[in-house]
Each structure stands twice: as structure tokens, then as C-alpha cells.
Amino acid sequence: GYFYLRAVLTQKKIIKLRMPVMSIKTILLVLGLILSNTVCAFAKDGTIDTGDTAWVTMSTALVMMMTPAGLALFYGGMSRYKNLLNTIAMTLVAYCLASIVWVGWGYSLAFGESSSLFVGNLNHLFLNGIDVDSITGTIPTIIFVLFQMTFACISVAIILGSVVDRMKFSSWIIFTILWITFAYAPVCNWAWGGGWMHKIGALDFAGGNVVHINAGVSGLVLALFLGKRKGYGKEAMIPSSVTFTALGAGFLWFGWFGFNAGSALAADGIAASAFLVTNTAAAMGGLAWLFVEWKHSKKPTLLGLASGAIAGL
């Protein structure tokens, strides 16, 4: 609407005020345009859902915390004191390297469209073709890239537990780059990028195959290849800080809500169900380990409780 004020001063006369009234047709036309634009903003297919975007963004931050905070403290606390700082440093450098590799070529190999059923292409090298307007599902593609990046980071960091005290820092750097490129990205493509596992209907909701089996098998192979730690079976392998391990388990437990519930890529009932199951599994795992250890050794330990919770997750 609008109005204007016209004042006319005449000889000893009052100010006259005139206010034109908009026609009914004009008012209806303006309201119609406003309502139609409002409806279109919510009805278009392929548009960004702010609720889903906010949830996946928060989940990305939660999963990110699992590596430089959760695993760093969890593994660092269980390692011998002389390896504490080195273990934490290896966790942090794994996160940094995996982040760069993922943005550079890892994402493209994992999610790039390709006729091959085993690996993607390099069309999205250094995120080529992805901008602020790109959408995956109901969230910005950039957020999807970051969420998947945190999965790649924690996957390679999980392997670190198999090589603590047995692998040089420089060798770990090389391994991280090669593993993300030739192990993680292809397996990710198989399950989530339209590869052969996806084609046969395999369901990997939150990384059971891509993350845990992949990292677990790789860690086993590395442990067998490197052999036992020096002094194993002869010297006491005393954890440097059980407190660190317990704190790390807490960070991992907290971050795992984003890991599992965030994998729904939406703020919906599936995410809520995953959230509930995640917490229940961790709690049950911790209690089961605690009571079994209590019965077996007549004494429960904080290390056992923390280990059980992570095993449940």
C-alpha cells in the first residue's frame, strides 16, 4: 500500500489531507504475487531444505571431532608414554592429509560418474564443477563433500591403532595418501558412488563396509606385516593415560551421533532412530565389557568400560 500527504495552506484555512485508496484489484494482485512466490520457494523439487542442511552440517562437525579429538586421545592414552605425542601427531596429520586428498581427487574417485563399477572418474578433480548452487538430495553438494570427507579422515585414522609404536611418521604420511586414493575411494564408490555393490542392492547405511571392514582389514594386514612391537611379551605395555582414553571414548561416543544419524542426510525419523540405536549400543557395549571383566578378573576397570563402549559403537 501507499499514501501521500498534500497540505495546502490558504488564508486562515486548515490543512487539507487527501489519501488515495488502492483499488481492490491492485491489492489482490500484490497479495497473489507474494503468496505465489512463497509457495514456489517451498514446492520446487531439488531445492535445499534448511533443516536437513543444518543437521548434516552439525553432523559434519561432530564426525570431524572424532579424529583429532576422539581417536587422538583414545589411541594416545592407550599407547606407552614415549609414544603419546607421536600417536596424537599421527592422528592429526592423518586428518590433514585425508582432507586435502579428498578435496583434490578422493571425492571425484568416490562419487564421480563413471561407466566403471569399481572407481569414479576425475571430472570433479579439486571439486571442479561443484559450486554454491550444486545440490545433492536436499543439501548443498559442498556440505555433502565435507560430510563424506570426515568419513575418509576417520577411516584412515582408525588404522593407526594397528601400527602404533611400529611405523615411522614419514611412512605413515605416505601410507595415508596411498590408502585414501587406492583403498578408501574405490570401496566408497562400490557402495555409495553407484559401483558394483550398489548395483546388486547392498545397503551400507553408515559405513559398515566402507569404513569399518575396509579399515579393519587394512589394519590387520599392516599389523601382520609389521610384526609385534619391540619388547612385546617381555616388557609391560602400560597405557600412558587411561584418563585420556576415557575422554577420547567420550568424544567418539558424542561424535558417533553425527556419524550414524547424520548418514540419513536428512532431519527425519530415520536419523532419530539411528541416534537412539547408537546411544543404546554404546551403553550396552560398555556395560557388557564391564561385567564380563568384573567376573573374569574380579575387578572392573575404566579402560574396559571405555573399550566396551567403543566396541558397541
Show which residues each predicted segment covers:
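N-terminal leader/targeting segments
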Residues: G1-Y2, S263
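Intrinsically disordered, low-complexity peptide-like regions
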Residues: Y2, K12-K13, L35
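Aromatic (phenylalanine/tyrosine) cluster motif
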Residues: Y2-Y4, F42
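A generic signature of intrinsically disordered, low-complexity regions enriched in glycine/proline
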Residues: R6-V8, V56
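Bacterial N-terminal signal peptides that target proteins for export
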Residues: T10-L28
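Hydrophobic alpha-helical transmembrane bundles of multi-pass membrane proteins
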Residues: S23-L313
